[in-house]
Amino acid sequence: MITIKKGLDLPIAGKPEQVIHNGNAVKEVALLGEEYVGMRPSMKVREGDVVKKGQVLFEDKKNPGIVFTAPASGTVTAINRGAKRVLQSVVIKVEGNEQITFTQYNEDELKKLTSEQVRQNLQSSGLWTALRTRPFSKVPASDAVPSSIFVNAMDTNPLSANPEIVLKEHWQDFTDGLTVLSRLHEGKLHLCKAGDSNIPTIDLPNLAVHDFSGPHPAGLSGTHIHFIDPVSATKSVWYLNYQDVIAIGKLFTTGEIYTDRVVSLAGPQVKNPRLIRTQLGANLSHLTENELSAGENRVISGSVLSGNTAIGPYNYLGRYALQVSVIAEGREKEFLGWIMPGKNKFSITRTVLGHFSSKLFNFTSAVNGGHRAMVPIGAYERVVPLDIIPTLLLRDLASGDTDSAQALGCLELDEEDLALCTFVCPGKNEYGPMLRAALDKIEKEG
């Protein structure tokens, strides 16, 4: 058992009921291009094309053989692009049930798969994109070999679903997926789960099971990798979430891609917070219809700490998102708010009365202050359990000193690993974009 002591479980209202319900009907789905770091698409479809589920929509020019497939059958209604023609989203109006099938194996054959067979099926189906590398959080190259693979079967994000509830419906598919991943390479396959959970395992020669406990970020893959198999400039690992392991198991046993998702629909502005069954890339306006309290709301694909605002061409459930979080837009100004006792405000420091309360808070998007310089008062050290010096690292990220940032461990991190630092920052700094800029520069220049 690895126990995390530093961190923060955000006391946010609107926690979901841990029972799975059917969500609203999905009429539109999309793939979001900007989720795939460094990807340059070569489009294989046009607006108006009719596509089958599993059909290739685009391929990565930088990574030949890595394809991105349709999560549903229907008609391509929009290919949205932003500045410099960056791909924002490929939108499909869901129609029919036609799909492309892939190679199918029985239970005995799974244990004898070769690495080449696993790669071929994952890459041709588009499920290879479930894997991400650390460092850089990119889809791995088609011929890359990791030091190890991490399966994340726990979630400590605010308002998250309990993976054990989701996995109960798919025990066999999950263990089949683990078997397939164990055949992908000869290194270790690390299954990380909560210490008090009852997650199924299977007897595999290279499978190692690890228990974690403690506050968020105990459930992040970056935390698991840091304590078990740290990365460097010359060493990489891959990671994926438990629902993608289910999808991999189903792909190899049925020959069909599985795009169902169970996500938590939760937050202070959700009328009935609960777990809902929906589809990868679902339109979040449709999914949240008649589910939200009145007023101006911010719908987030992912966690309230590190998710993406679902608006315009990005109004869809992300490829790696297991949550839909909803908070109110905090546009109101509070007169002399800095001098008030703040019994309805939360802070990690003892500056408001809410710090001493055990109640849940209706957080909004308001940052309660303007941008200012970093103030090293020990807030970052309280929420970062990794063996790094957060204040110095964040200073280097803010100043663009990538050499020092690399020496201090930035290659181990992803945006979600610094989300708590952003939340507790007295200077209202956004450290995720700073980290991404540093990682891009390091990858390009070394």
From Swiss-Prot:
Q: Which domain of life does the UniProt lineage start with?
A: Bacteria
Read off the InterPro entries from this record: NqrA, NQRA_2nd, NqrA_C_domain, NQRA_N
List, in alphabetical order, the GO biological process terms annotated in this UniProt record.
sodium ion transport
KW Membrane (keyword) present: no
List the Pfam families hit by this protein, alphabetically. Answer: NQRA_2nd, NQRA_N, NQRA_SLBB
As its record notes, the protein acts as a catalyst of: a ubiquinone + n Na(+)(in) + NADH + H(+) = a ubiquinol + n Na(+)(out) + NAD(+)
State which Enzyme Commission number(s) the record gives.
7.2.1.1
Q: Which GO terms describe its molecular function?
A: oxidoreductase activity, acting on NAD(P)H, quinone or similar compound as acceptor
Keywords from the named record: Ion transport, NAD, Sodium, Sodium transport, Translocase, Transport, Ubiquinone
Key word NAD present? yes
The family annotation for this protein states: Belongs to the NqrA family.
UniProt function note:
NQR complex catalyzes the reduction of ubiquinone-1 to ubiquinol by two successive reactions, coupled with the transport of Na(+) ions from the cytoplasm to the periplasm. NqrA to NqrE are probably involved in the second step, the conversion of ubisemiquinone to ubiquinol.
Complexes and interactors:
Composed of six subunits; NqrA, NqrB, NqrC, NqrD, NqrE and NqrF.
* HAMAP family in the cross-refs: NqrA
Q: Which protein, by its recorded name, is this?
A: Na(+)-translocating NADH-quinone reductase subunit A
Q: What is the lineage of its organism?
A: Bacteria, Pseudomonadati, Pseudomonadota, Gammaproteobacteria, Pasteurellales
